[in-house]
Structures are given as C-alpha cells and as structure tokens.
Amino acid sequence: MTHTLHLVIHGRVQGVGYRAWCADEAVSRGLSGFVRNRREGTVEAVISGPSEAVAAMLEACRSGPAHAHVERIEEALAEAPPAGTGFRVAATV
C-alpha cells in the first residue's frame, strides 16, 4: 500500500546537507517525492512509497545528517506524486 506524507522539518536543517542527505535516503528506500528549502529556514519534503519505507524514512528524518539538529517535524497526509517521477531536490520556495 502506498503512503504519502508532507513534512516540514524545523531546527538547524539548512546549510548542513539535509536536502542531499534526504534525497539519498529516499532514493535508497525506493521512495518518490521531493525535498526543498523554505525561505523561513525549514525544509519541506513529500515522501511517497510503501508504508514501511515511508515510516522508516520519517524516523530517519528525525535525526537527519550529522550536522543537522531537528527540533520537530510537522507531518500530514498528502497526495502521491505522479508515478515514475522519482525523488528530487526542488527549488527553494
């Protein structure tokens, strides 16, 4: 069963390689979606795939890469991205 989450990650998550780390983690788990910086200092992501892989990715996002410090993650259900789109780092909004 496919599960899709919209995440907003708060904390020290910009300038620490969070987006590249997130994309690598998502691709290694076979997920689709995107990750991007937001001008107010958070990182936004949509992750979609098998429920177990999405749950594991969410747990990984709570820690992030070595220099990140995640304070909290807002999560909400979201619509799945179009099939076959893969996972990408998107432009800042």
Swiss-Prot record:
Active-site residues, Swiss-Prot/TrEMBL: R19, N37
Ranges of residues in domain Acylphosphatase-like: 4-91
Catalysed transformations (reactions): an acyl phosphate + H2O = a carboxylate + phosphate + H(+)
A Pfam short name: Acylphosphatase
Class of the enzyme per the UniProt entry, highest EC level: hydrolase
GO terms, molecular function: acylphosphatase activity
Keyword terms, alphabetized: Hydrolase
Gene3D superfamilies named in the record: 3.30.70.100
PROSITE patterns, alphabetized: ACYLPHOSPHATASE_2 (PS00151), ACYLPHOSPHATASE_3 (PS51160)
EC number, UniProt record: 3.6.1.7
PANTHER family: ACYLPHOSPHATASE (PTHR47268:SF4)
Protein family membership: Belongs to the acylphosphatase family.
Name used for this protein in its record: Acylphosphatase
Organism: Azorhizobium caulinodans (strain ATCC 43989 / DSM 5975 / JCM 20966 / LMG 6465 / NBRC 14845 / NCIMB 13405 / ORS 571)
